[in-house]
């Protein structure tokens, strides 16, 4: 059963509707910060990058929010999980951007570790009294698009989003040890507008991806996929990726984090897959192991990085255009 949360809004007048659903991958140097703006003007941010670095990540997020999409607050901040590269930058962001509601999978499971305890205390400092803890199957009350949670706290959907076909890629599929860290607790969701669907599973790890895919594909097919866990080999189970059949993927990797050539190789084996866009060129990868330069937002090491973003602009007819802010390169795709 889907629970849709109804929250009191500060204004009775809705924001002017836009024509597109916009998704921004804000570069936070191997962390995560994915901003979604619905046609009805709702703003949803999953993760806030790293702490420190003279407010680098918080400032990059605020720039995209206020200058690129011309919004002044975040309606829903989703913490995928409590690790420094995802929730570490939240307090710095909350000091400069208004956030209405903080969405999470529940209390951190790493509070017994000094760094995990510090992250958890930081989260409570800004989120206490504004938290919304979700379960798979829940949905946010957005205008012009839907957002349904498909994973949280090592649990997946109890019922498929679509018809739930048996997945032929499960036969002989590789299994990996169950991950008990915060990565395995990651919040994941599907955003849908018309025929278009976008999947983001945070840093969900292999064994829980397998549960979403086998024996039945609980998610269905999507058009756009944020590669799980920055393109690291601990995630991206082929039995899931081949089942959801993305046309396009975006990888939020850093120059030396994620961006595994084997993940890129695996995507090329997906039926109907067209392009991978990357936040960074993996400085350790060869040209043969990398995507077309036009689809990479940043090159070189972190110290000199300008923090270029990648965006997807989704039209109501199902077409979606990926844009690289570094060079202005854009390419349009069709939904299934």
Predicted features along the sequence, with ranges:
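Extracytoplasmic/secreted envelope proteins and their assembly/folding machinery
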Residues: 33, 58-62, 87-91, 117-121, ...
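Long, structured stretches of catalytic cores involved in phosphate-ester chemistry, encompassing
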Residues: 108-109, 113-114, 213-300
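Conserved beta-strand hairpin/beta-sheet module of binuclear metal-dependent hydrolase folds
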Residues: 18-73, 182-206
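Sec-dependent N-terminal signal peptides
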Residues: 3-16
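Active-site metal-binding motif and surrounding structural segment of the metallo-beta-lactamase
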Residues: 39-45, 49-104, 108, 215-232, ...
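Flexible, acidic/histidine-containing loops and adjacent segments that form or flank the divalent-metal
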Residues: 18-21, 28, 87-208, 269-336
């Amino acid at each position: 059963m889907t629970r849709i949360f109804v929250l009191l809004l500060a204004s009775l007048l809705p924001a002017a509707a836009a024509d597109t659903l916009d998704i921004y991958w804000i570069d936070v140097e191997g962390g995560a910060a994915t901003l979604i703006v619905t046609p009805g003007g709702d703003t949803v941010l999953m993760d806030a990058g790293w702490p420190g670095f003279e407010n680098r990540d918080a400032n990059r997020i605020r720039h995209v929010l206020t200058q690129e999409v011309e919004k002044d607050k975040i309606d829903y901040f989703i913490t995928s999980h409590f690790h420094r590269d995802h929730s570490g930058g939240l307090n710095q962001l909350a000091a400069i951007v208004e956030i209405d509601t903080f969405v999470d999978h529940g209390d951190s499971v790493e509070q017994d570790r000094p760094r995990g305890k510090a992250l958890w205390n930081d989260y409570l400092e800004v989120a206490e009294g504004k938290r919304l803890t979700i379960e798979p199957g829940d949905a946010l009350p957005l205008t012009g698009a839907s957002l349904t949670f498909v994973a949280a706290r090592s649990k997946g959907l109890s019922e498929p989003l679509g018809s739930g076909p048996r997945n032929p890629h499960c036969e002989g599929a590789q299994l990996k040890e169950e991950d008990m860290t915060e990565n395995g607790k990651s919040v994941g969701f599907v955003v849908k507008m018309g025929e278009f669907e976008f999947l983001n599973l945070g840093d969900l790890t292999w064994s829980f991806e397998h549960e979403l895919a086998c024996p039945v594909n609980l998610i269905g097919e999507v058009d756009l996929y944020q590669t799980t866990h920055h393109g690291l080999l601990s995630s991206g189970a082929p039995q899931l990726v081949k089942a959801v059949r993305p046309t396009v993927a975006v990888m939020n990797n850093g120059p030396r984090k994620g961006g595994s050539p084997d993940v890129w190789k695996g995507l090329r084996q997906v039926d109907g897959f067209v392009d991978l866009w990357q936040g960074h060129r993996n400085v350790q990868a060869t040209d043969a192991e990398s995507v077309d330069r036009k689809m990479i937002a940043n090159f070189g090491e972190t110290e000199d990085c300008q923090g270029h973003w990648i965006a997807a602009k989704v039209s109501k007819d199902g077409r979606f255009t990926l844009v690289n802010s570094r060079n202005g390169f854009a390419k349009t795709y069709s939904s299934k």
